């Protein structure tokens, strides 16, 4: 008797990428499989059944793939948060810390209206830096984050704790220990 595959079964692990000692969790294999992708989107939507969500915000880059599909299923708009200099028009920006240095993400200054309920999505929650920056951008525009949804949580890197300390509801479809 065969068991039903879980989301985790569709995710490929690549050893020593991008650096030695890293186990890279590759979601492109999940995205490439129609059944796996459908399972992931359906499971990411499940916690929000009946909840008001006005827009989905996706973090660059794989959050765009998930966010677009989820927004379509919810019949709501999609808003990208991108690296600095990638969005045309007027934006606001937020810096955040990386392992070595800092980065900046941006959102259009008219993308979120005050009081809108937002679902923030990305493929991976590691340290929480990018997601925290995205949350700050949405809140600066007056939006309210309903929840943050991810495919993968890397709990050893502490991102969930960072987001929960900001008062966020966090959902992930699976977790992998280690780096």
Swiss-Prot record:
Which reaction does this chain catalyze? AMP + diphosphate = 5-phospho-alpha-D-ribose 1-diphosphate + adenine
From the UniProt record, report the name of the gene that encodes this protein: apt
Q: What does this protein do?
A: Catalyzes a salvage reaction resulting in the formation of AMP, that is energically less costly than de novo synthesis.
Pfam families membership: Pribosyltran
Query: What protein am I looking at?
Result: Adenine phosphoribosyltransferase
For this record, the Gene Ontology CC terms, alphabetical, are: cytoplasm
Keywords for the protein's UniProt record, in alphabetical order: Cytoplasm, Glycosyltransferase, Purine salvage, Transferase
Q: This protein's superkingdom?
A: Bacteria
Q: In which pathway does it act?
A: Purine metabolism; AMP biosynthesis via salvage pathway; AMP from adenine: step 1/1
What InterPro entries is this protein classified in? Ade_phspho_trans (IPR005764), PRibTrfase_dom (IPR000836), PRTase-like (IPR029057), UPRTase/APRTase (IPR050054)
BP terms from Gene Ontology: adenine salvage; AMP salvage; purine ribonucleoside salvage
